[in-house]
Amino acid sequence: MAMHRRTLMKRTGAAAGAAVLGPAFLANTPAALGAQDENTLEFWDTLNADPRQSIVETLAEDFAAENGDLTVEHRGWTLEELQDTLPRVVDSNQGPDVAQVNNGESLMGPMIRAGQLVDISSYVEEYGWAEGLPEGLLARNMYSADGTEFGTGQLWGVSSEAEIVGLYYNRAIFEEVGVEVPTTLDDLEAVFQQLLDAGQTPLVFGNLDGWTAIHLFGNIHGTMTTREYLDGIVYRTGEQSFEDQSIIDAAARLQQWVSNGYLLEGFEGIGADDAAALFEAGSGAMLMQGSWQAGSIGENLGADAAGFFLTPPLEEGGNVLHVGGVGIPYAITTNATDPDLAAALINKLVSEEAFAALVEAGLLPAGEIADDQITPDTLSGDLYSAWNSAVRNDSLGHYLDWAAPGFYDLITSELQRLLGNQVTPEEFAANLQEFYAASFE
């Protein structure tokens, strides 16, 4: 077979360089967008930076080699780009065979109702995709057959990774200032203040992209809410309201963090990637970010120099519903030329081989991590222990933007206003509820 030119792309899609790979794999090739012939399999996701991008592209290259004359093309997008682009291109029959489709009403529900996703029930049984994860995690990729009920019914996508959002910390700064990992939310705020008094930035945070505030607010709210409330609001039972006291109290607490100076100065104009880069360069004591950042932090700050802990509860020993769950699932679009082959690719992306590669990179695969793979007092050890604990204690919450179609844009905008003290906590909650209630009409 002829050699293909592999074009590496930046997140915006502009060319960044080129390298020659194996005979049947293309990565981020701009000309490759759209429906392909029967010998080409295209998949899109949000894996656009190493080590995650390298892992998925190695798996795709192996899959191409295992399937004769097949060409596999991969494109990694930002989440915002993928969510905006995918439904439109599938509707025009120019979409990929396989794509990550964000959970809930953010994207999956609307695409099912629009007839843009393939029913994968037969493949779930064939490949055993429902095995090994608790029902509460599987529910995040489930919808009824008509796409109207979230969290029940059948699987519409499969996740290769798990996700949990917590606090990365710089061990050297903690030791220098004389603080320890906190066990309550009040303790965390006391640590923030000690770090601030010592001239350190307590929490490196950038909200230019908007989505980071969902995580920050969500984890504060997770200390104040219940499973019944959070499942009800996200799975849209119609019995819960955003004008709940827990939402108002969490919003007030977040505003207090801003006024106390706990967040990185100028966070409004700093992107999530830039904030992470600052922390990874040794600037700032903590970074609230998802498990997907662990590989980069381990590589840059150091696997022994960084640690990880989950947002502590209001009272010691209490429960917190942490932002997270399973990673964005891979689904088969109705543009797929060969759904059977598309399903086989997904199976490769969620295989034991993929699981091992993610663990090797210090990332978090979907499923419990075996004790013999956990090294204490390391970044990955902290992360894996925290994840296993959250799974066993049913302590995984949700991403609030899953709650309604278009809710992502609304909640990111309202959180920016909340952080800027442009709305009160009560107004913030009322604005969320007005949009949420309208989504049922």
Name the predicted role of every residue range:
Residues 235-236, 323-324, 361-371, 382-440:
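C-terminal capping/gating helix-and-loop segments adjacent to ligand/active sites or protein-protein/ligand interfaces
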Residues 61, 65-66, 91-92, 177, ...:
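Extracytoplasmic/periplasmic substrate-recognition and gating elements
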Residues 105-165, 216, 307:
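Hinge/lid segment of periplasmic solute-binding proteins
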Residues 146-160, 165, 189-239, 284:
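Extracytoplasmic/periplasmic solute-binding protein
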Residues 121-136, 224-249, 299-301, 313-321, ...:
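Short, solvent-exposed loop/beta-turn-alpha elements that line the ligand-binding surface or hinge
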Residues 192-195, 235-268, 307:
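Glycine-centered hinge/linker elements that transmit conformational signals in sensory
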Residues 2-116, 126, 131, 181, ...:
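Conserved N-terminal structural module of periplasmic/extracytoplasmic solute-binding proteins
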Residues 76-85, 185-190, 266-280:
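Short helix-initiation/N-cap motifs at beta->coil->alpha
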